[in-house]
Design a protein with these regions (language model features):
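Polytopic transmembrane helical bundles with strong interfacial aromatic enrichment
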Residues: 1-170
């Protein structure tokens, strides 16, 4: 991400920006990154091979067995049920936050590049959410799982692109 930011610095000179908008976009980027990291735990534990129903996890909103390890914090990293539930929850919060944030920020900026990045971010977060559901329901079809991971990178890049476009002047 730092390499992309530096490349954008070279390609696009600094224009008057909206400092708060840039910070908000970087916060959204951080949330997307956290969600992607939680997805790494899902992939690493093969957690997508279980609870292949949506939106409920085998009939429960909060699955039985959530945070069962002792100490409970270990469940966040080692328990398939907890890891998958947390990723679902983070993905939902991230989707809502990116869409709401993009809508609000589009009202604040007239920069065409930032606006394009925000539109792309909204489309990508919806695509990402749907790909996550499809991956889960398919019991982790590799093509869908790979596309889901690649879309996360595209989403982070689109948010970074928008944040760079509205960064404050030095």
């Amino acid at each position: 991400l730092a390499l992309i930011w530096t490349a954008l610095d070279v390609l696009r000179p600094r224009a008057p920006g909206l400092g708060k908008a840039s910070r908000r976009l970087l916060l959204l980027l951080g949330l997307v990154f956290l969600t992607a990291m939680s997805g790494g735990f899902v992939a690493g534990l093969d957690a997508g091979m279980t609870y292949n129903t949506f939106p409920l996890m085998d009939g429960d909103l909060i699955p039985e067995g959530y945070l069962v390890y002792d100490p409970a914090w270990k469940s966040l990293f080692e328990d398939i049920t907890t890891v998958q539930f947390n990723h679902r929850l983070l993905a939902t919060l991230t989707g809502v936050a990116v869409i709401a944030g993009a809508v609000l920020l589009m009202r604040q900026t007239t920069d065409p590049i930032a606006r394009r990045g925000l539109i792309v971010s909204k489309l990508l977060v919806i695509t990402q959410y749907l790909l996550g559901i499809a991956t889960l329901l398919s019991v982790v079809a590799i093509s869908l799982a790979t596309l889901h991971q690649a879309t996360a990178l595209l989403l982070m890049t689109a948010l970074l692109f928008s944040a760079h476009a509205v960064r404050p002047s030095r």
